[in-house]
Amino acid sequence: MKTYLQLLEHILQHGVEKSDRTGTGTLSVFGYQMRFDLAQGFPLVTTKKLHTRSIVHELLWFLRGDTNISYLKENGVTIWDEWADNNGDLGPVYGKQWRSWPTADGRTIDQLSEVVQQIKSNPDSRRLIVSAWNVGELDKMALMPCHALFQFYVANNKLSCQLYQRSADVFLGVPFNIASYSLLTHMVAQQCNLDVAEFIWTGGDCHLYLNHLEQAQIQLTREPLPLPSLAIKRKPASLFDYAYEDFEFLNYQSHPAIKAPIAV
């Protein structure tokens, strides 16, 4: 995962100081891309320990079309707690947009189901896109989508995925996002009887919060360890039928966790 460390270093060297919605302040660069060959290992950051349980359960929660944190709480995941209302609701965030995007005529569109079917029936399509950036519902969301849009691509019987992340909390958020979308790529590939190729991460406003700079510098002193591999233990009937127990990260070694405050 030297690629990720290079992004940390790039921001520390070239970032400009900016104000932000949370009032914390950031060092920021605009426009950055990282590529991960999924055949060479699963891209879990090894220079600090990641909570893989949160990564897997959050993705399963998105895939359920759920926007209430009760499922996450039941499974020991707290990463959305700060944004939920008193009933645990977040408004029409990722899961709602992925699975039931509302149309002007009162229908809803299951973007993910449609894309999986398109990959199977028309793998050369250039329209294999899922968007969470629903302009008409942004003001109802507890947090507007940071990872806003992703696109699949099939070549040589292998599946790639590219994510566009308009706002990237590089120390806390991006390691989760890389792992989450890499996991999704593996799952979609399995459902479509494809091998995996690349996960490509493209960031817009890529930033380190000013109260994360010391933590980023600590991480840069650590030598990356070999990447783990992902085992998917069964192939369920659909993309939406996976369970937490279906996934195992084999030989995940990491340096200790590094604590950092969340900017709300």
Curated annotation (Swiss-Prot):
Subcellular location: Cytoplasm
EC identifiers of the protein: 2.1.1.45
Protein known as: Thymidylate synthase
CDD domains (UniProt xref): TS_Pyrimidine_HMase
Function: Catalyzes the reductive methylation of 2'-deoxyuridine-5'-monophosphate (dUMP) to 2'-deoxythymidine-5'-monophosphate (dTMP) while utilizing 5,10-methylenetetrahydrofolate (mTHF) as the methyl donor and reductant in the reaction, yielding dihydrofolate (DHF) as a by-product. This enzymatic reaction provides an intracellular de novo source of dTMP, an essential precursor for DNA biosynthesis.
Family the UniProt entry places it in: Belongs to the thymidylate synthase family. Bacterial-type ThyA subfamily.
Pathway(s) this gene product operates in, as recorded in its UniProt entry: Pyrimidine metabolism; dTTP biosynthesis
Biological processes per GO annotation: dTMP biosynthetic process; dTTP biosynthetic process; methylation
Keyword Thylakoid belongs to the record: no
Keyword Chaperone: no
Subunit structure, as described in the record: Homodimer.
Alphabetically ordered keywords of this record: Cytoplasm, Methyltransferase, Nucleotide biosynthesis, Transferase
Binding site for (6R)-5,10-methylene-5,6,7,8-tetrahydrofolate: 51, 169, 263
Molecular function, one GO term: thymidylate synthase activity
InterPro entries: Thymidate_synth/dCMP_Mease (IPR045097), Thymidate_synth/dCMP_Mease_dom (IPR023451), Thymidate_synth/dCMP_Mease_sf (IPR036926), Thymidylate_synthase (IPR000398), Thymidylate_synthase_AS (IPR020940)
